[in-house]
């Protein structure tokens, strides 16, 4: 008789399923989100446990020397131009997930899973998604070995991090970095436009993580104060935004309320040619910037994504008294942070990024390790304390447009 050497905590899995059901009930009561996220996810606790267990073991596999990353979507079998529907169903198993996942390493490609009349799970096809796709199904995103995001109704609910299971809560992370992004200007409407800065910064962090070489990004406000923290001369200095010459600006969004947000998406703006083109160009820009962080040294850019230099070496500012104390937190439910020291942040890349963020209070530093761990560094204006957000890859909005809707909705409700 075979026994699993590892089982995910059943109470955790049951709690995730209960939260999915609670979200479905909330959507039914809330007409705004019911209209956007109309999909009705029906998966039993046992099916969910089997799905997560199989995805977990597949995430540990190496295929021809490469680590496998893939995503699963639980949805009914259907025929569509963007879906390759298999003639014959294949029982859900880790081996086939590894085979298919090795060819679909993209945040816009999914392996489709359904349940038969007897409740058994099967692989039934492959789905290709556009950047404007609303992720309303149950979606499992494998970020690396043992690192799994659980997303439903367009919102990240929970995650597995190696041998830990957590509920994801990015609110503390967002509250820490958005004041720096929204710092210039006080007009509420303009601040909403600055939300664009926020999610493009997360896309760049995704791109940094994807190249798997490790990298450092320094995001700085206007002016040249940051130069005191950089060793001169800088090997690759200049300035550009890395946008296409024929860049099409995204339409201005006069979003006064959550209802305006609903109307914007319901009227099909996401599918308009100019919107799609502009969004694609911005994502290409983010990928180009993220890729350059693979060059040894740091990339410095403005909050509007104008690149000042890359391959830069960080130094301690002469006027800085230095710091040894930090507060470390993760985007997890109930994590309010803990006291730590510089020495436990990681290697030289993390230490230098932390020092830069401490010396430049209006800046944000981002580090992606070769293993795919992402950390954000920023100095809190209220206390002067250096805040480090570790495991930030859990909050990089891999859910795409759906995540933007959720977070923008919450932002509009606060203003």
Residue map of PLM features:
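Divalent-cation
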Residues: 1-415
């Amino acid at each position: 008789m075979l026994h699993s050497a590892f089982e995910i905590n059943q109470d955790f899995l049951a709690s995730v399923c209960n939260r999915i059901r609670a979200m479905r009930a909330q959507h039914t009561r809330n007409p705004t989100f019911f209209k956007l996220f109309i999909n009705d996810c029906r998966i039993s606790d046992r099916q969910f446990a089997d799905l997560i267990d199989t995805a977990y073991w597949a995430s540990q596999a190496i295929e021809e020397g490469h680590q496998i990353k893939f995503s699963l979507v639980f949805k009914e079998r259907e025929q569509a131009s963007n879906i390759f529907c298999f003639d014959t169903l294949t029982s859900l198993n880790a081996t086939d997930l590894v085979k298919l996942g090795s060819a679909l390493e993209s945040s816009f490609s999914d392996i489709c899973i359904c349940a038969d009349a007897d409740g058994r799970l099967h692989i039934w096809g492959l789905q290709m998604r556009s950047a404007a796709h609303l992720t309303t199904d149950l979606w499992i995103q494998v970020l690396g070995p043992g690192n799994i995001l659980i997303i439903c109704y367009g919102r990240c609910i929970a995650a597995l991090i190696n041998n830990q299971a957590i509920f994801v809560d990015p609110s503390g992370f967002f509250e820490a970095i958005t004041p720096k992004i929204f710092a210039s200007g006080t007009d509420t409407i303009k601040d909403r436009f600055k939300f664009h800065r926020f999610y493009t910064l997360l896309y760049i962090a995704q791109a940094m993580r994807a190249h798997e070489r490790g990298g450092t990004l320094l995001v700085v406000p206007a002016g040249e104060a940051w130069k005191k923290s950089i060793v001169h001369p800088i090997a690759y200095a200049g300035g550009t935004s890395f946008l296409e010459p024929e860049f099409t600006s995204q339409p201005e969004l006069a979003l006064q309320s959550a209802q305006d947000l609903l109307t914007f998406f319901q009227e099909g703006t996401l599918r308009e040619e100019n919107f799609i083109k502009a969004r694609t160009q911005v994502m290409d820009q983010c990928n180009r910037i993220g890729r350059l962080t693979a060059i040894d040294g740091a990339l410095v850019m403005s909050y509007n994504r104008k690149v000042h230099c890359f391959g830069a070496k960080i130094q301690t500012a002469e006027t800085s008294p230095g710091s040894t104390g930090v507060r470390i937190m993760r985007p997890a439910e109930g994590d309010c942070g803990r006291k730590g020291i510089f020495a436990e942040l990681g290697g030289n890349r993390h230490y230098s990024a932390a020092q830069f963020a401490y010396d430049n209070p209006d800046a944000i530093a981002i580090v992606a390790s070769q293993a795919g761990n992402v950390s954000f560094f920023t100095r809190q204006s209220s206390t002067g304390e250096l805040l480090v957000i570790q495991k930030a890859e859990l909050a990089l909005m891999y859910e795409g447009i759906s995540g933007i809707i959720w977070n923008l909705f919450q932002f509009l409700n606060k203003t």
